[in-house]
């Protein structure tokens, strides 16, 4: 009987620990997404001023904070494309599409990227 009670107590303890772990992870994720969003917004602001390297830095930071943030990868791809780094642009577009395959903006940007590279015969943009 004591063994059964001990096992039930341990099971409840494990359930509580699991729930607490899940709940504590949620705010951390929300904070990471919020911080990533701030980096993306700042990146947009500096890109509009022509500061593309700073924008790349900000969008890279956003992807580090939240590796699931497809829009950050899309913006990063645009910046790499602008800077002429077509290999990195392609990689960033592909990552964005893997994260959000049905996002029409990302699909449109990727399709335009491919079309331009096909038309100009650039091999590094595939």
Region spans (language model):
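Helix-start (N-cap) detector for alpha-helical repeat units in TPR-like alpha-solenoids
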Residues: 36-37, 70-71, 104-105
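Register position in tetratricopeptide repeats
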Residues: 48-49, 82, 112-119
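Conserved structural position within tetratricopeptide repeats
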Residues: 61-64, 97-98
């Amino acid at each position: 009987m004591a063994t059964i009670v001990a096992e039930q107590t341990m099971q409840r303890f494990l359930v509580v620990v699991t729930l607490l772990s899940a709940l504590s992870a949620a705010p951390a994720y929300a904070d990471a997404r919020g911080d990533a969003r701030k980096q993306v917004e700042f990146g947009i602001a500096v890109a509009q001023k022509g500061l593309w390297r700073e924008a790349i830095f900000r969008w890279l930071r956003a992807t580090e904070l939240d590796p699931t943030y497809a829009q950050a990868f899309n913006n990063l791809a645009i910046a790499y494309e602008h800077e002429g780094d077509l290999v990195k642009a392609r990689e960033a577009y592909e990552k964005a599409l893997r994260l959000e395959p049905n996002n029409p903006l990302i699909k449109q940007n990727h399709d335009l990227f491919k079309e331009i590279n096909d038309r100009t015969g650039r091999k590094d943009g595939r």
